[in-house]
Amino acid sequence: MSRIGLAPIAVPKGVDITINGQVVNVKGAKGTLEVELPEPITAAVEDDEIKVSRPDDDRKNRALHGLARSLVNNAVVGVTEGYTKKMEIFGVGYRVQQKGKDLEFSLGYSHPILIEAPEGITFAVDGATKLSVSGIDKQLVGQVAAYIRRLRKDDPYKGKGIRYDGEQVRRKVGKTGK
């Protein structure tokens, strides 16, 4: 059985926590996040720690307990440190350019692809083939990075496409022919 939900969340200096029913507001140096807790789960602030609790040991409540604790912890880390996903582009002629807050990709299609930065997300381009997606909301950063990766998924035969930094792509051998 996982015991993630039982661990208290340390609240660093400069972070304000406000609990209003099932909604936990986390305010820090980088911004403000709001986490809505699942129905039976409750949270309380005690001695610079957030404690998440469940009413009973029902199977569903145990699962939601760990989830709620992780969501609140992600919000605390997000407003203090933030989250970043680094990505690389591989392939001849594949590149990315920053246009203001947005990104413009050239990925071998007949047209360039423009990605607008959602609110709370910032893009940074390093050279023509490296980029990073940053923000305070872990879920939104991962979602935007996954959308960008989906524009041109890594090809297992040629190794061309967009991948996360450090991601290992399983290469396949092509047909041998006669």
Curated annotation (Swiss-Prot):
Name a GO CC annotation attached to this entry: cytosolic large ribosomal subunit
Q: What is one GO biological process annotated to this record?
A: cytoplasmic translation
Q: What Gene Ontology terms describe what this protein does at the molecular function level?
A: rRNA binding; structural constituent of ribosome
**Which keywords does UniProt give here?**
Ribonucleoprotein, Ribosomal protein, RNA-binding, rRNA-binding
InterPro entries recorded for this chain?
Ribosomal_uL6-like, Ribosomal_uL6-like_a/b-dom_sf, Ribosomal_uL6_a/b-dom, Ribosomal_uL6_bac-type
Among the Pfam families in the record, one is Ribosomal_L6
Instruction: Identify the domain of life.
Output: Bacteria
The subunit structure is: Part of the 50S ribosomal subunit.
Q: What does this protein do?
A: This protein binds to the 23S rRNA, and is important in its secondary structure. It is located near the subunit interface in the base of the L7/L12 stalk, and near the tRNA binding site of the peptidyltransferase center.
Q: Family, per the entry?
A: Belongs to the universal ribosomal protein uL6 family.
Protein name, UniProt field: Large ribosomal subunit protein uL6
Q: Which organism is it from?
A: Corynebacterium aurimucosum (strain ATCC 700975 / DSM 44827 / CIP 107346 / CN-1) (Corynebacterium nigricans)
Record lineage: Bacteria, Bacillati, Actinomycetota, Actinomycetes, Mycobacteriales
* Gene this chain is encoded by: rplF
